[in-house]
Amino acid sequence: MKKLLTLLFAVTCVYGCSQTQNPTDESKTARIPMVMVDGELYLDTGYDSTIEGRCGVMDGEITSTVDGTERPIKDNQSNFGKDIGYQYGTTEGTIEIYQNEKWRIFATEDVREQIQSEHKNDIIQTE
């Protein structure tokens, strides 16, 4: 009986150790802030807008939200909050979202990569 219990305990330990959670499990990790506008997904670029003298009229408003681990699937839906205004950016493929008294630049995936690449090149040239 003692051997059987020892064997059962060992099997349980081995099985339990093999059931570790994957920290990169996409369904449970926070995603980059993003919003769906006009059927297009816009992602946070990490940059604030430098445009001054705005008209003050919003082009739209984020009206619904999903969990921070999800991707928005409806227009005017984000994964970071709602009741937030936005304006279309001066660069095609961008919108600017007013948050925390700053205008944050969001862009489609392709445009976001361009912006980040250009910014990276600017940093390299100034060093």
Residue spans for each PLM region:
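Positively charged n-region of N-terminal signal peptides that target proteins for export
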Residues: 1-4
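Short basic-aromatic helix/loop recognition motifs at nucleic-acid
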Residues: 7
